[in-house]
Amino acid sequence: MAPTIQTQAQREDGHRSSAHRTVPERSGVVCRVKYGNSLPDIPFDPKFITYPFDQHRFVQYKATSLEKQHKHELLTEPDLGVTIDLINPDTYRIDPNILLDPADEKLLEEEIQAPSSSKRSQQHAKVVPWMRKTEYISTEFNRYGVSNEKVEVKIGVSVKQQFTEEEIYKDRDSQIAAIEKTFEDAQKSISQHYSKPRVTPVEVLPVFPDFKMWINPCAQVIFDSDPAPKDVSAPAGVDMMSQAMIRGMMDEEGNQFVAYFLPNEDTMRKRKRDVEEELDYMPEEVYEYKIAREYNWNVKNKASKGYEENYFFIFRDADGVYYNELETRVRLSKRRAKVGAQSSTNAVLVCKHRDMNEKELEAQEARKAQLENHEPEDEEEELDLEKDMQEDSGEEREKPSDSENSESESEREEEERPADEDEEEEEDEESVKRRRERKSSGSESGDDRQARDEEEIFGSDDDSEEEEEEEEEGGARRRSNSSSVQHSASERASDSSDASDSD
């Protein structure tokens, strides 16, 4: 075929058309290709056919030491595909007000069970082994019977059967039997873990209530940061924190806050001397503490909403493990210093130790009685007292009708009896009143408990007034006791004179 010859106009037209192209075509050949003859497509799909001959029959390739020692470069990104912004922490913070995609909301939906009260659902819940489960039945069966195939149901079958077979805590006898069974189970030796057979105990210690320290109410104080002083070494800081005190205070604006006091050097020496001499404190000794931090406080006790019981354990050498109750939880957060407000960094707390007063001893006895649970119910005691008084009055009524010849003696007894009855009634009323006070102290209201917690944790400023009142009450009580003793002595003298007259 004869070659074609392009004119100058055709070349210019070709250049104009190629100028409008965005991506120019590149060819591996330097000269212009006049003819293109591309290979046709393969008429059939590729197939994998096993090669029947040995691959190493012509040549056996063996890598040289140069290839083995060559270290190939790992062309990977420096962050390995995990982009983490270490400068701005807000990069990965999730906005709680963001709207979820409707497709993702299904992941947060709870599994809603189909209503099982209908007759149709009850029929589909039945498993019929001899019936062939076709496809249109299986979908319907899975819809109604999915609750029977859950793992939770399979695991809880044995527990459910155990509770249905044994009716525990049904009546008083079963409760007593269950309580006695706990004591029997406690006597059994522990050989292995209840759920991990391969775990064996290293040491077994008995656990008891802490009868020694239960009379003192304990509180858990949680700091938002370490309150240790920064300018003191770690061992010395621990010693200072072991002697630290917290106290409620009020600023000039009337805002309450908690002050954290640390002992000064003189107080540390005094406390160290007390420990060496095995003394709780030295009488008439003054201990000074300097304020270290100021906190805002939040208190939760048994009367607070959402309160959770909290206990702690005490390990005593060769004596066992004892647990005690943390009935108050105090959270302390740092208090921001206000601009222009007078700082209280120079505040000093001066402490003197004293013996417990009668009110504090009664509170300790109430806590001890609450632990021992030896207080009988007040209603039963009142009923018993009423029965005893009725029986005594019935016997007194029957005595005059026994004999008519002893009229003078019965008259004398009736004259003597009202005084004794009055004394017995007064004693009974005092005992009932004392029990009611004990019960009221045991079941105090939320406000009283909160006030008591604040007084126990942060102290009271009315100690001196209470001591003066107690001294006055003690003197009055001693005077009343002496007068009652004289009155009883005079009564005994009158009784002896009456007896001699009757003889």
UniProtKB/Swiss-Prot annotation:
Top-rank taxon, per record: Eukaryota
Sections of the chain in a coiled coil: 352-381
Coarse class of the protein's main subcellular location: nucleus
Annotated spans, Disordered: 1-23, 360-503
Oligomeric form and interacting partners: Component of the PAF1 complex, which at least consists of cdc73, paf1, leo1, ctr9 and rtf1. The PAF1 complex interacts with PHF5A. Interacts with ctr9.
Family: Belongs to the PAF1 family.
UniProt-recorded name of the protein: RNA polymerase II-associated factor 1 homolog
Species of origin: Danio rerio
Gene that this sequence comes from: paf1
